[in-house]
């Protein structure tokens, strides 16, 4: 089955000031929350002697962060200019 993706995922700010902005923000918040939980679980697994499980959980966390980044772009949480974004960090 072909991978599905947002048709507008590479357009920064596409959902900003639209009816979708709130839903996209909720998805961003959910994904970033999941990143924290997965990384916390990875730390716990590492401390308890399960490095392989920790590695899997870190991979899942990275995938959730990737999802969050799409939502951040859609809602215009970053600008088109990479250097302006870096200055604001």
Q: Can you say where each PLM-predicted feature lies in the sequence?
A:
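Non-heme di-metal
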Residues: 1-89
């Amino acid at each position: 089955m072909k991978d599905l993706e947002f048709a507008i995922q590479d357009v920064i700010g596409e959902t900003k000031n639209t009816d979708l902005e709130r839903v996209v923000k909720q998805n961003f918040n959910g994904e970033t929350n999941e990143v924290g939980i997965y990384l916390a679980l990875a730390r716990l697994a590492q401390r308890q002697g399960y490095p392989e499980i920790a590695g899997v959980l870190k991979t899942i966390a990275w995938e959730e962060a990737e999802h969050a980044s799409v939502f951040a772009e859609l809602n215009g949480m970053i600008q088109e200019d990479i250097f302006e974004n870096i200055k604001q960090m």
